[in-house]
């Protein structure tokens, strides 16, 4: 990435070396996207509800992603990753406020989550390098609490600038496997890593599909990346990106999310898996269940629910679930069954899932 950011008129979008289409900006500073002709013949809709596979120019709405499409906004960092990116760019003399959406996507380039990549590619990444997690954790804390811009900033940027969420994190390759490793934020309790690891194991016991998780150095929670496999990257879109839903505020109800899951996957087993996640979130008090904490993946010609992530107790908005249950931010167990009935899950099945999960979570 050049230190003097150049002007970009258009940005090419790729998925596993195949050109998907082209992004540009309108005079109103809205993103415009058009699929590539070859991709129209052989590809798939990267965002079925908002970018169907059609030969036309799509123009993004001003909200909720400031004139970007949700699927491309997913590539951009938020929270910790955004702080890292802005701090790193300022350190290198780049005026962050003057960057447009295309330039920010070019900075992410090939380093983003999921399968989408952007050309020109200005990304700077560092792969297959081992770092001392304790040192990285201390540097992350300095970045959060001070204006620190030492060598640790460069290392964390190269290994985590595309990440989302509030907590500091890095992508590292360990024994030829790619991991996302989290550190504690200034607001977290000291044992946050152990807590998240415990709930990741509990979620698996509750029948929820999770990526492989690990507690590094007995304190840092790690999750194996599920947007990659040995041969390719896997196209991944968050519920926020899929539904054009604002993840920063309450904007979804689980009924809407479950219906979208069925419309997208056409598979009731995927709906039941998402229902399990809803019940688990209510049972453990995970109220930070915003629209970016659910994702879908396209692989082998099929859409599916991604493995679950970010499952641990949290306070949410004023003690309410960010994604409501039967329209309520503070639901009771009966609301879980009402949602099941609304979306066509048999009462016997819903009761069985609820009973199983609550029994495990109350141990």
Sequence positions of predicted segments:
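Phosphate/dinucleotide-binding and metal-coordinating scaffold of catalytic cores
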Residues: 1-291, 295-363
């Amino acid at each position: 990435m050049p230190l003097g950011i150049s002007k970009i008129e258009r940005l090419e979008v790729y998925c596993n070396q195949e050109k998907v289409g082209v992004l540009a900006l309108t005079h109103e500073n809205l993103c415009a996207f058009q699929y590539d002709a070859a991709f129209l013949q052989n590809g798939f809709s990267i965002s079925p509800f908002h970018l169907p596979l059609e030969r036309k120019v799509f123009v993004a709405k001003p909200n909720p992603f400031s004139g970007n499409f949700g699927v491309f906004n997913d590539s951009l960092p938020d929270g910790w990753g955004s702080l890292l990116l802005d701090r790193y760019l300022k350190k290198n003399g780049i005026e962050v406020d003057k960057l447009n959406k295309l330039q920010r996507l070019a900075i992410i380039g090939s380093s983003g989550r999921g399968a989408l990549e952007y050309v020109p590619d200005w990304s700077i990444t560092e792969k297959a390098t081992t770092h001392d997690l304790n040192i990285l954790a201390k540097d992350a804390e300095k970045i959060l609490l001070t204006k620190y811009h030492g060598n640790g900033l460069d290392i964390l940027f190269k290994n985590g600038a595309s990440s989302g969420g509030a907590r500091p994190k890095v992508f590292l390759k360990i024994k030829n496997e790619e991991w996302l490793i989290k550190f504690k934020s200034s607001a977290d309790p000291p044992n946050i890593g152990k807590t998240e690891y415990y709930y990741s194991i509990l979620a698996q016991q509750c029948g929820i599909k999770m990526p492989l998780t690990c507690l590094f150095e007995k304190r840092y929670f790690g999750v194996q990346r599920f947007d990659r496999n040995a041969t390719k990257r896997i196209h991944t879109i968050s519920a926020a990106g899929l539904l054009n839903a604002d993840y920063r505020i309450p904007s979804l109800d689980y009924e809407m999310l479950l219906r979208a899951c069925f419309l997208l996957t056409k598979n009731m087993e995927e709906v039941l898996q998402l229902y399990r996640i809803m019940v688990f979130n209510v049972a453990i008090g995970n109220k930070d269940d915003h629209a970016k904490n659910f994702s879908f993946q396209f692989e082998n010609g099929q859409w599916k629910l991604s493995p679950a992530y970010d499952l641990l107790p949290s306070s949410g908005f004023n003690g309410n679930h960010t994604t409501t249950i039967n329209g309520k931010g503070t639901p009771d167990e009966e609301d879980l069954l009402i949602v099941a009935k609304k979306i066509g899950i048999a009462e016997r099945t819903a009761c069985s899932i609820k009973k199983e999960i609550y029994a495990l979570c109350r141990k």
